[in-house]
């Protein structure tokens, strides 16, 4: 948990993102390969697919933070890659996507730490939201959006995990962090 502290803006945003990434990572703890691929809800999302998608997203964000955001429109190839990022291919395993997630996470957090929230940037087109042109932003907008996105993904992972076996992701995070039992939590 990101506990209350007096951090700089960028450190605070980084820690909120990292907290959500810990939840996403913990969501697979104790699952078999088959369970990690199951889609127990009405959507096609699985825990392993959520981890793969998050790693894909982190790689894109890291490139955007380091190299500037691409203002190019989304191509059919880009869209196909995006959709493929939600499902494990037959030749992929949960361990594969966890390794990709861990590598992407380290790079992602380093890119956030090196960013200037007040810096000038450009948000790429987002046609799914009716935005077809690049828009000027401060990097802060993009960093806060990362908190939003990672929290959404952590929430999805939590719901999927609860449907699989009743475990809540916050309890899994605390278990992995070695939090001792208390009146509100038991590992």
Which sequence ranges carry the predicted segments?
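Short, contiguous alpha-helical
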Residues: 3, 7-10, 14-29, 33-84, ...
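Acidic/histidine-rich alpha-helical segments that form the ligand environment
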Residues: 83-125, 137-152, 156
């Amino acid at each position: 948990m990101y506990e209350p502290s007096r951090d700089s803006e960028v450190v605070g945003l980084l820690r909120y993102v990292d907290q959500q990434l810990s939840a996403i990572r913990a969501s697979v703890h104790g699952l078999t390969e088959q369970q990690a691929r199951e889609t127990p809800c009405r959507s096609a999302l699985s825990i392993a697919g959520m981890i793969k998608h998050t790693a894909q997203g982190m790689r894109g964000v890291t490139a955007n933070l380091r190299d500037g955001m691409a203002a190019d429109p989304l191509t059919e190839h880009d869209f196909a890659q995006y959709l493929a990022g939600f499902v494990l291919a037959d030749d992929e395993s949960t361990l594969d996507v966890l390794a990709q997630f861990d590598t992407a996470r380290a790079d992602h957090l380093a890119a956030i730490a090196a960013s200037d929230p007040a810096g000038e940037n450009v948000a790429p087109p987002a046609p799914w939201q009716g935005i077809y042109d690049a828009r000027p932003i401060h990097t802060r907008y993009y960093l806060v959006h990362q908190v939003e996105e990672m929290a959404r993904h952590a929430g999805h992972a939590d719901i999927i995990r609860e449907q699989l076996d009743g475990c809540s992701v916050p309890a899994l995070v605390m278990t992995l962090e070695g939090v001792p039992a208390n009146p509100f939590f038991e590992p």
